[in-house]
């Protein structure tokens, strides 16, 4: 932090504070810290980066399969334990990556073909897939089907790169059985915000956790998400800024030197007088792994979840119970009891819910847990 002509310059940097490449067989976990940030910057960056991680990072997946001898998805094959539908679900779970592991360099988006030719008895796994030389399976032991006798299993696979669950081609254009592929390599992403330095100051720290399926590292996923956001904002840059603002009022021109992006850090010049009235978030404890140059103090824990922030701007009680994302059985039981919104649900106690047909103690506990975690609401035990 450097003081210049009445202004405070904050130089924010990303640091990897925890890396677990062998978190489990199919997950790579990393935690990153970005600091120092001004108040509200951490929330803005955290929401944007998390959204980009889950929807903008490219991955490779099987998009369709042509199974020899299969008439339709619900048919069975002689000598094969699994139905065609189960085989397709197993193929959907196969995790594929570039052979060199360099997922930052995207493929050319053309369609690739792979094949399976196996003869039983035995278990057919991802190891039996004959991939093109440029791609391979992350977990070769992933099960596909079980052959009970000397039956032969022949499958032609169609593979493509994409983003999240979006695919431009339609089901009609796919050969064989369509597979609802999920391309995203990022399995989970969370962030939390912590205060650093003087409790009356304007500095915050952003902690970002990323889990990937090992097709690329969390650091590579973060790089892709960052690049995607830069490209997006470059495309939607307002064209009138430079035309309508005079040079003396053009904020972009005034701060062009301090706001330049370079490497893994960026600078931001902000007047203290204009930011002292900014809204302060509650302070939280800082993990021991992080030792930045600024002085750290421990305050009340305030992990800020995205759902909680979004729900502050809507009338939660008028939301449908579908927003609780309960199991279909629980949701149907509530709707049959004419409980269609969260407001309807809050009119019931836990004891009242137990009187609903097929609604047991575990169902009540699940509803209470979701209300508490997502909406900070409680169901009264009794009236």
Swiss-Prot record:
Q: Which Gene3D superfamilies match?
A: 5' to 3' exonuclease, C-terminal subdomain, DNA-directed RNA polymerase, insert domain, RNA polymerase, RBP11-like subunit
Q: Which reaction does it catalyse?
A: RNA(n) + a ribonucleoside 5'-triphosphate = RNA(n+1) + diphosphate
| Note on domains (UniProt) | The N-terminal domain is essential for RNAP assembly and basal transcription, whereas the C-terminal domain is involved in interaction with transcriptional regulators and with upstream promoter elements.
**Family the entry assigns:** Belongs to the RNA polymerase alpha chain family.
Major localisation: plastid
**Gene encoding the protein:** rpoA
For region Alpha C-terminal domain (alpha-CTD), the annotated ranges are: 306-383
Q: Which InterPro entries match?
A: DNA-dir_RNA_pol_insert, DNA-dir_RNA_pol_RpoA/D/Rpb3, DNA-dir_RpoA, RBP11-like, RNAP_asu_C, RNApol_insert_sf
What job does the chain carry out? Answer: DNA-dependent RNA polymerase catalyzes the transcription of DNA into RNA using the four ribonucleoside triphosphates as substrates.
One GO cellular component assignment for this chain's record is: chloroplast
Q: Which SMART domains match?
A: RPOLD
Q: What is its EC number?
A: 2.7.7.6
Q: Which UniProt keywords apply?
A: Chloroplast, DNA-directed RNA polymerase, Nucleotidyltransferase, Plastid, Transcription, Transferase
Name of the protein this chain belongs to = DNA-directed RNA polymerase subunit alpha
List every stretch annotated Alpha N-terminal domain (alpha-NTD): 1-240
Gene Ontology BP terms: DNA-templated transcription
Instruction: Give a GO molecular function annotation for the protein.
Output: DNA binding
Where does it live in the cell? Plastid, Chloroplast
HAMAP family the UniProt entry points to: RNApol_bact_RpoA
Give the multimer and partner information.
In plastids the minimal PEP RNA polymerase catalytic core is composed of four subunits: alpha, beta, beta', and beta''. When a (nuclear-encoded) sigma factor is associated with the core the holoenzyme is formed, which can initiate transcription.
């Amino acid at each position: 932090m450097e003081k210049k002509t009445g202004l405070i310059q904050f130089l924010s940097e990303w640091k990897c504070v925890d890396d677990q490449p062998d978190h489990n067989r199919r997950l790579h976990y990393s935690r990153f810290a970005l600091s120092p940030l001004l108040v509200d910057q951490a929330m803005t960056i955290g929401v944007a980066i998390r959204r980009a991680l889950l929807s903008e990072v490219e991955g490779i997946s099987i998009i369709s399969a042509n199974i020899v001898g299969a008439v339709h998805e619900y048919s069975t094959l002689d000598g094969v334990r699994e139905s065609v539908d189960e085989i397709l679900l197993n193929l959907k779970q196969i995790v594929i990556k570039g052979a060199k592991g360099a997922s930052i360099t995207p493929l050319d988006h053309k369609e690739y073909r792979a094949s399976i030719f196996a003869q039983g008895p035995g278990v057919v796994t991802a190891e039996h897939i004959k991939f093109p030389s440029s791609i391979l399976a992350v977990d070769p032991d992933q099960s596909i089907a079980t052959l009970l006798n000397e039956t032969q299993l022949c499958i032609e696979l169609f593979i493509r790169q994409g983003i999240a669950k979006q695919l431009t081609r339609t089901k009609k254009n796919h050969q064989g059985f369509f597979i609802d592929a999920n391309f995203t390599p990022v399995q989970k992403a969370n962030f939390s915000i912590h205060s650093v330095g003087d409790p009356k100051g304007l500095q915050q720290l952003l902690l970002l956790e990323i889990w990937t399926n090992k097709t690329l590292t969390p650091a590579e996923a973060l790089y892709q998400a960052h690049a995607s956001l830069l490209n997006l904002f470059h495309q939607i840059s307002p064209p009138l800024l430079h035309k309508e603002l005079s040079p003396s009022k053009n904020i972009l021109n005034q701060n062009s030197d301090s706001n330049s992006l370079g490497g893994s850090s960026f600078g931001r010049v902000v007047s203290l007088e204009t930011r002292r009235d900014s809204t302060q978030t509650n302070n939280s404890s800082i993990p021991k792994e992080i030792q930045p140059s600024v002085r750290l103090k421990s305050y009340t824990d305030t992990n800020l979840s995205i759902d909680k922030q979004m729900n502050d701007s809507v009338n939660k009680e008028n939301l449908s119970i579908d927003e609780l994302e309960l199991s279909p059985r629980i949701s149907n039981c509530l709707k049959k009891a004419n409980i269609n919104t969260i407001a309807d649900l809050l009119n019931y106690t836990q004891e009242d819910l137990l009187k609903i047909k097929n609604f047991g103690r575990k169902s009540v506990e699940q509803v209470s847990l979701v209300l508490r975690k997502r909406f900070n609401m409680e169901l009264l035990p009794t009236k």
